[in-house]
Amino acid sequence: MKKVVFFLLDFYRYGLSSFRQTLGMYGVCRYYPTCSQYCREAVQKHGIIHGLYLCLRRLMRCHPWGAAGWDPVPEKSNLGIKRTKKADHPLKKKVSLMRVMHLFFK
């Protein structure tokens, strides 16, 4: 399945993108690495599902009014998903009624 994704990315990169330039539509990518390189690297590092998700997020950021510059593929441990343990969640802590009453009626 990765080979199909890589084939489509290479087809765009070397076929369609080059054809656009011959028609005079010069679209220079705002980021480094380019979006097609980013997608290829994301699929290699994270697999098809997470890689295509990261690729879609990148394509949504790539517009004329967006940011530009260095935008590497995140490492596996940093996918933007932060999880908390149930015990550490602030709403899961048990507080006795006497303690709450003590705070209100000092």
UniProtKB/Swiss-Prot annotation:
This is Putative membrane protein insertion efficiency factor. It is found in: Cell inner membrane. Belongs to the UPF0161 family. Could be involved in insertion of integral membrane proteins into the membrane. It holds the Pfam family YidD. Coiled coil: none annotated. GO terms for cellular component: plasma membrane. It is a peripheral membrane protein. It comes from the Bacteria. It comes from Methylacidiphilum infernorum (isolate V4) (Methylokorus infernorum (strain V4)). Keywords: Cell inner membrane, Cell membrane, Membrane.
